[in-house]
Amino acid sequence: MKVLVGTASWSDKSLVASKKFYPREASTPEARLRFYATRFPLVEIDTSYYAIPLAQTSQAWADRTPGHFAFNIKAFRLFTGHATSPRVLPPDLRAELPPLKKENFYFRDVPPELRRALWDRFKEALEPLRASGKLGMVHFQFAPWLLRNKSGLAHVELCVEAMAGYTVSVEFRNKTWFDDAHLGQTLAFERALNVVHTVVDGPQGFHNTVPPVWESTHMNYSLVRLHGRNQETWNIKGATVASERFDYDYSDA
């Protein structure tokens, strides 16, 4: 068994600001990635959740890392059911959006032909990593309001079908997926789709947290994501970046 350990992003604001990891000369994103890859064999790309990266960008990531290095990449937020601003779409595809009544839109608001174009653009962004053998999992962190019901199951199936040929990992943020009545069914559903179940270690007691379910649903891979035990900041209002919600500097107690 081989275990790969990494962080979510090599340029996380708190990681850079701590000045405890990167040497002084690693002052650019390129230099930080090159240094990071000498310390860890894996990283999770977080920026792809906020906007679909350019293929040139992912090619640069592949070029700046050694052959054994792996990238897990988060799926674009529109695909996972989160509110999305038109501003983050590629300009040519943004023009294909129908008129919107609100500032943000959701996957359900997107016409089928534009959905296909967005999936294609996302996979184009992954191709340099895939071609170099450095693409790990494509991680779908679904929105907290994605319930385990008919429409929720159908949306997960749609995403997995759209990413056929890729190793897909799924993370649910709603308790209906793992309550006593549905835990076994959810794991069976994940196994039937051949997706990687995500073991989530995070604070408990919130509407958007789930218990850690230590099960494996994929023949080759398992995934554990450590979100910390940060009760006070988990749902902090006004956070502009994910790092504002996390605190990993714990006392020995």
Predicted feature residues:
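Residues lining hydrophobic/aromatic ligand-binding pockets adjacent to catalytic sites
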Residues: M1-A253
